[in-house]
Amino acid sequence: MIIVTNTTKITKGNGHKLIERFNKVGKVETMSGFLGLEVLLTQNTVDYDEVTISTRWNAKEDFQGWTKSSAFKDAHSHQGGMPDYILDNKIAYYDVKVVRMPMAAAQ
């Protein structure tokens, strides 16, 4: 399993604009190898808002299949250009090495 994060710096007070885009079912849920998605808002930032989109995949190839799909291109087309509230973003890939579950789930 891998986790891919997209951490985005957003003008202060506008983090909700990006968060709202993910608060509905989309095409990613239909993709092969997709395991889940979380939207995280960093606490206590001063100069900007920071939103991290964290997705879980069976394998990196599954994530790459998503990024090459027409559904991905449609979702990221930014008609009218990149939103002006986005300052910067960074993509990171993580190999999951250990997963722990609550005791009730482990039994």
From Swiss-Prot:
Reactions it catalyzes: heme b + 3 reduced [NADPH--hemoprotein reductase] + 3 O2 = biliverdin IXalpha + CO + Fe(2+) + 3 oxidized [NADPH--hemoprotein reductase] + 3 H2O + H(+)
A GO term, aspect molecular function: iron ion binding
Top EC class of this enzyme: oxidoreductase
Keywords for the protein's UniProt record, in alphabetical order: Cytoplasm, Heme, Iron, Metal-binding, Monooxygenase, Oxidoreductase
Pfam families tied to this protein: ABM
EC number annotated for this UniProt entry: 1.14.14.18
Superkingdom as given in the UniProt entry: Bacteria
Residues given in the record as Fe cation binding sites: N6
Positions contributing to heme binding: H76
An example Gene Ontology biological process: heme catabolic process
Record's GO cellular component terms: cytoplasm
Occurrences of domain ABM (ranges): 2-94
Site residues, Transition state stabilizer: W66
Location relative to the cell: Cytoplasm
Subunit structure: Homodimer.
Family: Belongs to the antibiotic biosynthesis monooxygenase family. Heme-degrading monooxygenase IsdG subfamily.
Summary of the function given for this chain in its UniProt record: Allows bacterial pathogens to use the host heme as an iron source. Catalyzes the oxidative degradation of the heme macrocyclic porphyrin ring to the biliverdin in the presence of a suitable electron donor such as ascorbate or NADPH--cytochrome P450 reductase, with subsequent release of free iron.
Protein name as annotated: Heme-degrading monooxygenase
Gene: isdG
